[in-house]
């Protein structure tokens, strides 16, 4: 039976993001009373398809599409109020009532226009200097986390006190404008139409940033909350909570393909720190894993295929899987499933179970390859090394598995899958040591195979 009191589930991506977490979070909220975002910012994107209608979310937790479910943005999230209200207005136009159900931690650091300007200028300076781009979304996520770690960030709670906000903003602009103009040479860069209203001569201006922040303050005040307290109280009252990770494990600042990573911890352990609950409140960790691998932007990718070449398996994955980033629209690089990578993700997340997504994309491929390990400096290793430098030197070791021609689209029972599709999934379980509890066979809520429900009591 489904637990009726106080069972909490963490959903994390196990690859480089884009694994299909949004659909599964939406599916699981049928059994939850609250959904929590605990890290990242509006650099992450989730696409939900409900009754054939696509909805893209970047900051608002995916559970907002379920009437009556409370949604929380925890202290681990860096918040662009401008982007949040763009999203709120779009959802309200679509008929989703959410302001009374959305709670935002007062401890969230704010993303402000100078953070995005720093992001853009740094990538431009790297390119100008002949260095490889990190592949950021240019939305100010990294610089906002830098201010947090340096203990100088403006936080949501500062918006309640205009004089305090103005003083801190002046201090931050003095610092960041010096970096922009003197170190990065920002006068020479084109910052685009989004940042133009806030800038002059390569510097970010005080008044437009302050005025916009004060407008947002009035709108945010009804949603500001002590999220840590509210989550703990909800748990004590028996609510089921769902903690929604953004991006993926291999983008984690500590455990990912450093330095080609994001600026936050994407692993399950951060669900506690990023929302203000104790680790004992996290009962089940669901790892979302695409049936093949994709990656957006730069960085090592051991099993990458020639996904731009027509007629190849990689091209099949790219086109059939519609592999374009939700946030940036960039094409995702595609490759074979990497079980050695998944072993690393299982280790650092403490996965309870797996959900394999986009299995249907592999329909029609005659044969599939599974990476079981790598050759690294003449030795065989069965788990992904730490950091980009070692991963770049890895040569994948593959097993070949026969594909299937029958469609898996919309299949809702495991034993109704083609035989080779079942063998493929079972081999993933064997290599990684993590049981598969769910399989997604299409983008809609109903296109799901359930073997064990994460909210099922132990």
From Swiss-Prot:
The keyword Cytoplasm applies. Belongs to the adenylosuccinate synthetase family. IMP binds at residues 18-21, 43-46, 137, 151, 247, 262, 330. Pathway: Purine metabolism; AMP biosynthesis via de novo pathway; AMP from IMP: step 1/2. It comes from Albidiferax ferrireducens (strain ATCC BAA-621 / DSM 15236 / T118) (Rhodoferax ferrireducens). Keywords: Cytoplasm, GTP-binding, Ligase, Magnesium, Metal-binding, Nucleotide-binding, Purine biosynthesis. GO terms for biological process: 'de novo' AMP biosynthetic process; IMP metabolic process. It is found in: Cytoplasm. Its cofactor is Mg(2+). InterPro entries: Adenylosuccin_syn_GTP-bd (IPR018220), Adenylosuccin_syn_Lys_AS (IPR033128), Adenylosuccinate_synth_dom1 (IPR042109), Adenylosuccinate_synth_dom2 (IPR042110), Adenylosuccinate_synth_dom3 (IPR042111), Adenylosuccinate_synthetase (IPR001114), P-loop_NTPase (IPR027417). Substrate binds at residues 326-332. The active site is at residues 18, 46. GTP binds at residues 17-23, 45-47, 332, 358-360, 440-442. GO terms for molecular function: adenylosuccinate synthase activity; GTP binding; magnesium ion binding. It catalyses: IMP + L-aspartate + GTP = N(6)-(1,2-dicarboxyethyl)-AMP + GDP + phosphate + 2 H(+). Pfam families: Adenylsucc_synt. Its EC number is 6.3.4.4. Plays an important role in the de novo pathway of purine nucleotide biosynthesis. Catalyzes the first committed step in the biosynthesis of AMP from IMP. One of its GO terms (cellular component) is cytoplasm. Homodimer. Mg(2+) binds at residues 18, 45. This is Adenylosuccinate synthetase.
């Amino acid at each position: 039976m489904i637990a009726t009191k106080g069972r909490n589930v963490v959903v994390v991506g196990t690859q480089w993001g884009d694994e299909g977490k949004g659909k599964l979070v939406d599916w699981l909220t049928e059994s939850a009373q609250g959904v929590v975002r605990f890290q990242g910012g509006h650099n992450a994107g989730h696409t939900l398809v409900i009754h054939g209608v696509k909805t893209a979310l970047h900051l608002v937790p995916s559970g907002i599409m379920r009437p009556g479910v409370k949604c929380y943005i925890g202290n681990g999230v860096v918040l662009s109020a401008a982007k949040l209200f763009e999203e709120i207005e779009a959802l309200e136009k679509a008929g989703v009532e959410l302001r009374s159900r959305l709670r935002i931690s007062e401890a969230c650091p704010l993303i402000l226009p100078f953070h995005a300007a720093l992001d853009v200028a740094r990538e431009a300076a790297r390119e100008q200097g002949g260095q490889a781009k990190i592949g950021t979304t240019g939305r100010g996520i990294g610089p906002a986390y830098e201010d947090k770690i340096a203990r100088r960030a403006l936080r949501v709670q500062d918006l309640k006190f205009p004089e305090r906000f103005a003083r801190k903003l002046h201090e931050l602009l003095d610092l960041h404008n010096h970096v922009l103009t003197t170190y990065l040479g920002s006068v020479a860069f084109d910052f685009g139409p989004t940042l133009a209203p806030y800038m002059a001569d390569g510097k970010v201006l005080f008044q437009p940033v302050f005025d916009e922040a004060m407008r947002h303050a009035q709108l945010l005040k009804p949603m500001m909350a002590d999220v840590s307290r509210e989550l703990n109280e909800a748990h004590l009252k028996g609510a089921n909570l769902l903690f929604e990770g953004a991006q993926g494990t291999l983008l984690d600042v500590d455990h990912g393909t450093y330095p080609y990573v994001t600026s936050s911890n994407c692993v399950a352990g951060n669900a506690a720190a990023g929302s203000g609950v104790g680790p004992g409140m996290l009962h089940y960790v669901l790892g979302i894993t695409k049936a093949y691998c994709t990656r957006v932007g730069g960085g090592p990718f051991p099993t990458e295929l020639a996904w731009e070449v027509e007629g190849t398996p990689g091209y099949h994955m790219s086109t059939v899987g519609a592999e374009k980033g939700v946030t940036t629209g960039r094409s995702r690089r595609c490759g074979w499933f990497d079980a050695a990578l998944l072993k690393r993700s299982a280790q650092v997340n403490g996965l309870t179970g797996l959900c394999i997504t986009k299995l249907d994309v592999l329909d029609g491929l005659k044969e599939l390859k599974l990476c079981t390990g790598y050759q690294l400096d003449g030795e065989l290793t069965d788990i992904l090394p730490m950091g980009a430098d070692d991963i770049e030197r890895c040569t994948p070791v593959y097993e070949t598995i026969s594909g299937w021609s029958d469609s898996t689209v919309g299949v809702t029972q495991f034993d109704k899958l083609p035989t080779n599709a079942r063998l493929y999934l079972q081999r993933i379980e064997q290599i990684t040591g993590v049981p598969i509890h769910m399989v997604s066979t299409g983008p809609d809520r109903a296109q799901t195979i359930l073997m064990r429900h994460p909210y099922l009591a132990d």
